[in-house]
Design a protein with these regions (language model features):
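Hydrophobic residues on short alpha-helical segments
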Residues: 10-14
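A short acidic, leucine-rich amphipathic alpha-helix
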Residues: 23-28
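Short capping segments at the starts of secondary-structure elements
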Residues: 15-22, 33
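Alpha-helical structural context
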Residues: 29-30, 48
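Short amphipathic alpha-helical interaction segments
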Residues: 33-44
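Short basic alpha-helical hairpin corresponding to helix-turn-helix/winged-helix-like nucleic-acid-binding
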Residues: 45-90
Length: 90
């Protein structure tokens, strides 16, 4: 329903990285949506990313929305980061 808005918010959240963004910050960038509309679109995005086809999900921590890897990815991430450390130390 809100496909354009989803793409915009998704892109902004991706760019924000680990810090994530609040509804207020998103509202400052996407002025054509009010805070309630932004919250609705974020809820839709959260539902979209719950599908098993995605390795990431959209979460909210203390009013901040951000993308994180799903728990099923964590063993692979451990291998990635442990091999990266070994490679940089040698």
């Amino acid at each position: 329903m809100h496909e354009h808005e989803k793409r915009v918010l998704e892109g902004l959240l991706f760019l924000s990285g680990d810090e994530g963004l609040s509804i207020e910050q998103l509202n400052g960038c996407v002025e054509e949506l009010n805070k309630k509309e932004i919250e609705t679109v974020l809820d839709e995005l959260m539902q979209d990313y719950l599908a098993d086809v995605h390795g990431i999900e959209l979460v909210r921590f203390g009013g901040i929305y951000k993308f994180v890897s799903k728990e099923a990815i964590h063993p692979y991430a451990q291998k990635l980061f442990s091999s990266t450390k070994v490679a940089t130390l040698s």
